[in-house]
Amino acid sequence: MEHKKLIAVKREKPLISSYLDNKNKNPYVSDLNRANFFYANFVTKVEIERATVFKIRFQQGFGSELRGHHFVVAMQTSKESNQLVTIIPLSSVKETKQYNKKSTIFIGEVSGIPNTKQSVALVNQIRTIDKIRLFGDRALATFVDMVCDEIDKYKGEFEIQEKEIYRLTKEQFEIILDAIDNYLLIGSVKRKYY
């Protein structure tokens, strides 16, 4: 298990927000918008290597979309200057559930993850996310006392506590890449692991 530190830097040109006009009387929506606006005003400075596994929180989902906390695997190396990373969610195997063998791929146990079970990669739920989602809960916890007016006054950068990250084995990552090839019907693609 390794640790990474995230450096978040205030954007040079702050975003203009209609979120913070206090017209919305619902405190939950208001707090959610405040958190979203806070994240949007920072860019992350961290390199993510492919096959790295993180735990993130998916926001509200519709129907069968994922929601809540899940482990995800980064599908490509994302340089410090790139704000996005493409991920595939992982889920634990449920004995009673029948899986689509083309879109839900068995990858076994991911070493290092606490209370780990046999895992599957949900290839049909591949998505691209902003890197702040990898560290977002910790960012919010770090600044829970900060009010919106103070956010605008804040200058410079902040460090967020270390975050545990894990890695898939080369074999596990190859299984996922093969599954993507088959799922998208693109055939074999020349690729390298690290």
Per-segment meaning from a language model:
Residues S64-G112:
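Compact nucleic-acid interaction/catalytic patches
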Residues F58-Q59:
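Short, surface-exposed secondary-structure boundary micro-motifs
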